[in-house]
């Protein structure tokens, strides 16, 4: 099932989210240290990624402006964004950098350990060269 909104192509974006989009791997074992985790569930993550999905779910025409790797995790993120109705025409792909990953544990109510795997990752490569002329501020 595709949640894409039937927006008119000429309609301007309500929101363009720029920044981190990554893959979050949450440990399936709650209340267990990460070193004891046996399995993980994969989700779209990153502040900008989460906001683009949330606003799309609320009915806004949202776009994601970031970079992902051409690796399988980058393909996963692009597919998830599209599934959620987020416009990915501004989402760039780079073959030279891996998509960022985060491994997270869940120990409610106040402990949520996480490990970032973001060394020189794709979304950190975003720069002015990725902005096309129609997207640039006037």
Residue ranges and their predicted role:
Residues 129-138:
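Single conserved hydrophobic/aromatic residue that forms the stacking wall/gate
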Residues 117-120, 132:
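Divalent-metal (Mg2+/Mn2+/Ca2+)-assisted nucleotide/phosphate chemistry catalytic cores
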Residues 96, 108-110:
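Short strand-connecting beta-turns/loops that link adjacent beta-strands
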Residues 2-86, 110, 114, 121:
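Glycine-rich phosphate/adenosyl-contacting loop at the front of the ribokinase-like
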Residues 101-105:
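Short beta-strand scaffold segments in enzyme catalytic cores
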């Amino acid at each position: 099932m595709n949640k894409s909104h039937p927006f008119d192509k000429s309609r301007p974006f309500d929101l363009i989210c720029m920044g981190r989009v990554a893959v979050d791997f949450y440990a399936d074992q709650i209340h267990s240290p990460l070193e004891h985790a046996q399995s993980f569930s994969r989700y779209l993550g990153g502040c900008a990624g989460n906001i683009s999905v949330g606003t799309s779910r609320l009915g806004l025409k949202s776009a994601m402006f970031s970079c992902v790797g051409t690796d399988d995790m980058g393909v996963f993120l692009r597919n998830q964004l599209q599934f959620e109705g987020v416009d990915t025409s501004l989402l760039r792909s780079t073959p030279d950098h891996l998509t960022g990953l985060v491994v997270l544990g869940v120990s409610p109510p106040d402990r949520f350990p996480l490990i970032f795997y973001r060394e020189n990752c794709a979304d950190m490569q975003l720069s002015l060269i990725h902005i096309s002329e129609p997207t640039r501020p006037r």
